[in-house]
Regions:
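Long, compositionally biased interface segments
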Residues: 220-234
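C-terminal segment of N-terminal export signals and the immediately downstream linker at the start
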Residues: 20-54
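Alpha-helical scaffold segments that form or flank carboxylate-/histidine-based iron centers
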Residues: 56-70, 91-112, 180-182, 187-196
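Extracytoplasmic/secreted envelope proteins and their assembly/folding machinery
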Residues: 75, 114-117, 133, 147, ...
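Short helix-capping/linker segments at secondary-structure and domain boundaries
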Residues: 19, 23, 118-128, 207-210
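All-alpha RGS (Regulator of G-protein Signaling) helical domain and cognate RGS-like helical scaffolds
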Residues: 69, 80-89, 94-98, 102-167
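An amphipathic alpha-helical core segment
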Residues: 152-224
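N-terminal secretory signal peptides and thylakoid transit peptides that target proteins
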Residues: 1-14
Length: 235
């Protein structure tokens, strides 16, 4: 009974602040915190930059809610759902491909958001080059054409979802608009770039203006990350 209470307590503490880097505040015991965190099979990775580093695409408040509340909640929910189940031993990638129901929804949302943060950079927004640019020109006609197709497809996702750029094993590119938590991995494709078009992704900064958000999204795209994903897709 006491053990159970301890686990529940540390999970709650972790979801509230562990991922924001303030889990070892004064007076808290590091060993017990570490034990609690280690019990969770899935951990939200740190944000790859400070919360205010994506201005003016996103305000600090927008990122703090999106990363600290929404993204964190998918990990917390997932850890609760897999407790004592075989899924606790699976990788997050495997759960995205093979999972079902609520476990899939939370695993994919956990995965998708981590990928989304990596698709952005405070120094992003430059144009891609090399093989990736050549493939974009080959498959879409050029950067301007690709940007328009991806923007339109993402803006038009009905309800909540994601706009994806994905590659097959031959390196052919495809724009995949996806509902809810769907991910190209589920369809045998490798994700290269994504934009989150759930309202929670932009509502603090853009209110209902999804199109204006997706237009601004391009100013922070981390093309180096996209190119790395493309190189791995064809490997
Ligand atoms: Mn989101």
């Amino acid at each position: 009974m006491q053990r159970r209470e301890f686990v529940v307590g540390t999970l709650a503490a972790a979801s509230a602040g562990a991922y924001l880097g303030n889990n070892l505040s004064a007076g808290e015991s590091p060993p017990s915190t570490h034990t609690g965190v280690a019990k969770m099979p899935f951990e939200q990775p740190p944000l790859p930059y400070p919360m205010d580093a994506l201005k003016p695409l996103f305000s600090e408040e927008q990122v703090s809610f999106h990363y600290g509340k929404h993204h964190a909640a998918y990990f917390k929910n997932l850890n609760g759902l897999v407790e004592g189940k075989p899924e606790a031993q699976m990788s997050l990638d495997d759960l995205v491909v093979k999972g079902s129901g609520a476990i899939f929804n939370n695993a994919a949302q956990a995965w998708n958001h981590t990928f989304f943060w990596n698709c952005l950079s405070p120094t992003g927004g430059r144009e891609p080059n090399g093989e990736l640019l050549a493939a974009i020109v080959r498959d879409f006609g050029g950067m301007a054409e690709f940007r328009k197709l991806f923007t339109d497809a993402s803006v038009k996702v009905f309800g909540s979802g994601w706009g994806w750029l994905a590659s097959d094993k031959q390196g052919k590119l495809e724009i995949i608009p996806a509902g809810n938590a769907d991910n190209p991995l589920r369809h045998g494709k490798t994700p290269l770039l994504t934009v989150d078009v759930w309202e929670h992704a932009y509502y603090i900064d853009y209110r209902n203006e999804r199109a204006r958000f997706v237009e601004n999204f391009w100013t922070k795209v981390n093309w180096d990350f996209v190119a790395q994903c493309y190189a791995k897709a064809k490997a």
